[in-house]
């Protein structure tokens, strides 16, 4: 998959996954995702 930096595009893709890659600074959840197995 590819990373999108356009806010409106986040809705088009998977909100959960796209957000995690596009907004790593959004919340601590991003850190958890990196350590958690898919």
Swiss-Prot record:
Q: So what family is this one in?
A: Belongs to the protease inhibitor I39 (alpha-2-macroglobulin) family.
Q: Spell out the GO cellular component terms annotated for this protein, sorted alphabetically and separated by semicolons.
A: extracellular region
User: In UniProt terms, what function does this protein have?
Assistant: Is able to inhibit all four classes of proteinases by a unique 'trapping' mechanism. This protein has a peptide stretch, called the 'bait region' which contains specific cleavage sites for different proteinases. When a proteinase cleaves the bait region, a conformational change is induced in the protein which traps the proteinase. The entrapped enzyme remains active against low molecular weight substrates (activity against high molecular weight substrates is greatly reduced).
Record keywords, A-Z? Bait region, Disulfide bond, Protease inhibitor, Secreted, Serine protease inhibitor, Thioester bond
Q: What is this protein called?
A: Alpha-2-macroglobulin homolog
Which organs or tissues contain this protein? Answer: Hemolymph.
Q: Which residues cross the membrane?
A: none
A Gene Ontology molecular function term for this protein is: serine-type endopeptidase inhibitor activity
């Amino acid at each position: 998959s590819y990373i999108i930096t356009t806010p409106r595009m986040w809705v088009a893709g998977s909100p959960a996954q796209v957000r995690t890659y596009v907004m790593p600074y959004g919340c601590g959840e991003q850190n958890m995702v990196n350590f958690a197995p898919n």
